[in-house]
Design a protein with these regions (language model features):
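Short, active-site-adjacent cap segments at secondary-structure transitions
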Residues: 13-15, 51-56, 104-105
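Surface-exposed, active-site-proximal loop segments in enzymatic domains
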Residues: 19, 58-65
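Short beta-strand segments
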Residues: 6-10, 48-49, 98
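Ligand-binding beta-strand-loop-alpha-helix segment within the catalytic cores
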Residues: 62-113
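N-terminal active-site beta-alpha-beta segment that forms phosphate/nucleotide-binding
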Residues: 29, 36-37, 43-44, 48-57, ...
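N-terminal glycine-/serine-/threonine-rich phosphate-binding loop
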Residues: 1-43
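General structural feature for long, well-ordered alpha-helical segments within catalytic domains
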Residues: 1, 5-6, 26-33, 60, ...
Length: 113
């Protein structure tokens, strides 16, 4: 049995049936399942997408520069992570958000070195 897992959630999955914005029911559903696994002793790392809020490549069609569009997509990922972490905490499980781009005090900075 594995003790550590990496879970990838698409941004669209956090947007409910429409796949846009943040759907509280979707966040609650995922959080309950994640909390149940964590309470059973599983260590879970979660990577969220941000496509429910903004997709960098689709920004090109709207006049956004590729690099700026990608940056907005990364911010969307952080927004989703903050939302999901709050719902996980509401289930009584510790949750932290990390970013390789310094954004303190919003989220903790991660640097593998």
């Amino acid at each position: 049995m594995y003790k550590r897992v990496l879970l990838k959630l698409s941004g669209e999955s956090l947007g409910g049936s429409v796949g846009k914005g943040l759907d509280p029911e979707s966040l609650r559903k995922y959080s309950k399942e994640i909390a149940q696994a964590a309470k059973a002793g599983l260590q879970i790392a979660i990577v969220n997408g941000g496509g429910n809020i903004f997709r960098g490549l689709q920004g090109l069609d709207k006049g956004f520069d590729r690099v700026e569009g990608d940056r907005m997509g990364m911010l969307a990922t952080v927004i989703n992570s903050l939302a999901l972490s709050q719902f996980i905490k509401d289930e009584g499980v510790k949750a932290e958000v990390f970013s390789a781009t310094p954004m303190e005090p919003l989220v903790r900075y991660y640097n593998r070195d």
